[in-house]
């Protein structure tokens, strides 16, 4: 009898653990849907992909379990954007199929963070900046990063997300900085350009070597050119 009671208690515990599993419920509302195309969600930490079918009326939903809060890349037709999903937070996403990357509205517990991530105010160095002189480029990068951090702070989001996002913003903002030695000779019409000590010092300051950061797609994109730039130092 005691054994049966123990079995029931163990089973009860297993069931309560099972029912308490955190699941993020995502609901999609798509205008002008393309039924042949699914929403693809790529989890940046694991690389795992989830697909969500969108029906003729533009509706789709999915419940996702077994993940920690993290950045996720969403793709639909040709558009893509960065999301932040949390297993404790439901999210409703509404967009036009042709305009998802530019304009998605969010509702639910995860709305504030994801609305911020789509902010038009976030800016980064770009190809046109490659013609700038070094000092001007460093100043512009620093100014953009400071402005991006202000946008983040103004959003008043949870502290743990804000701390992570400041790191992600660094690689987002300075993505082209690591490519400067590659592109400046052409765009700056300066074939004799050799990166200065100040350039390498700045590059070193914004390039932590940390395997834990490989969960950020921005870091993975930034790192190879930074390593390449360091390997050419003194050549």
Stretches found by the model and what they are:
Residues 1-27:
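Bacterial Sec-dependent N-terminal signal peptides
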Residues 4, 112, 136, 140-143, ...:
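Exposed alpha-helical structural elements
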Residues 166-234:
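Extended amphipathic alpha-helical segments with heptad-repeat/coiled-coil character used for oligomerization
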């Amino acid at each position: 009898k005691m054994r049966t009671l123990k079995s029931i208690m163990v089973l009860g515990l297993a069931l309560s653990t099972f029912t308490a599993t955190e699941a993020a419920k995502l609901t999609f509302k798509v205008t002008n849907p393309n039924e042949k195309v699914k929403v693809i969600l790529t989890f940046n930490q694991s690389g795992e992909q989830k697909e969500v079918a969108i029906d003729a009326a533009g509706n789709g939903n999915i419940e996702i379990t077994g993940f920690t809060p993290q950045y996720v890349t969403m793709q639909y037709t040709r558009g893509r954007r960065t999301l932040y999903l949390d297993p404790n937070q439901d999210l409703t996403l509404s967009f036009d199929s042709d305009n998802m990357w530019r304009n998605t509205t969010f509702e639910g517990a995860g709305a504030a963070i994801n609305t911020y991530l789509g902010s038009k105010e976030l800016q980064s160095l770009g190809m046109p900046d490659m013609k700038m002189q070094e000092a001007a480029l460093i100043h512009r990068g620093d100014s953009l990063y400071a402005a991006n951090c202000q946008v983040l702070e103004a959003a008043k989001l949870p502290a743990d997300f804000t701390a992570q996002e400041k790191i992600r913003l660094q690689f987002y903002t300075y993505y082209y900085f690591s490519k400067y030695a590659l592109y400046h000779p052409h765009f700056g019409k300066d074939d004799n350009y050799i990166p200065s000590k100040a350039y390498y010092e700045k590059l070193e300051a914004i390039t932590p070597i940390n395997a834990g950061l490989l969960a950020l797609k921005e870091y993975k994109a930034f790192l190879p050119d930074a390593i390449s730039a360091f390997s050419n130092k003194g050549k």
